[in-house]
Amino acid sequence: MSFVTTEIQDAVAVLTIDRPKALNALNPEVLADLKAAFEAIDQNAVRCVVLTGAGDKSFVAGADIGSMSTMTKAEGEAFGKLGNDVFLMIESFPLPVIAAVNGFALGGGNELAMSCDIRLCSDNAVFGQPEVGLGITPGFGGTQR
C-alpha cells in the first residue's frame, strides 16, 4: 500500500500523504513513497507540485513516534538520513513545490513544509518544532531551512 497518492490535473501534480488516522505522521515507508512519487513526476508534463496531507486535521504531525520507538540505532540513523535526503530532494526539485498546509505541521511536518518553495495555509494551520522542548534536534534539516 502506498502512503502517497498522486493526481495530475491541468499540469499540476498533487501529492497527498495519506495516513489521516496517524495524522499523516512520517515513517520510513511514507518517506520512501514520497521519494518515489517525486521521482515519478514527468517534469515535461507537469508545471508545479502541490504537496498536502489527507484529512483536515494534519498536513504532517511529525515523525511516527511509535515507529521510531522500535528502531535500532542503525535504523534510526537510516531514518534520519532518508528524511534528510528526501527533504533535500524536494528543496532542490526543479519545479515549484507548494505545501498546502491543513492543520498540524509539527516537527518533521514543519520541516517538510519548509523544504517546499511556497506554503499556503488553511485557517487551522499550526507550525512548530516541539522536539526542541525535549532537547532533541530536528532530524531532517529543520535548523538549516
Regions found by a protein language model. Name each.
Residues 15, 51, 64, 112-114:
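Hydrophobic/aromatic residues within transmembrane alpha-helices
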Residues 86, 90-92, 100, 106-145:
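CoA-thioester-processing core
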Residues 30-33, 79-82, 112:
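Hydrophobic alpha-helical membrane-association signature
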Residues 53-89, 105, 135:
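Glycine- (often His-adjacent) and acidic-residue-rich active-site loop
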Residues 20-23, 56-57, 62, 68, ...:
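A short, glycine- and basic residue-enriched loop/turn
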Residues 1-52, 88:
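Conserved CoA-thioester-binding segment of acyl-CoA-metabolizing enzymes
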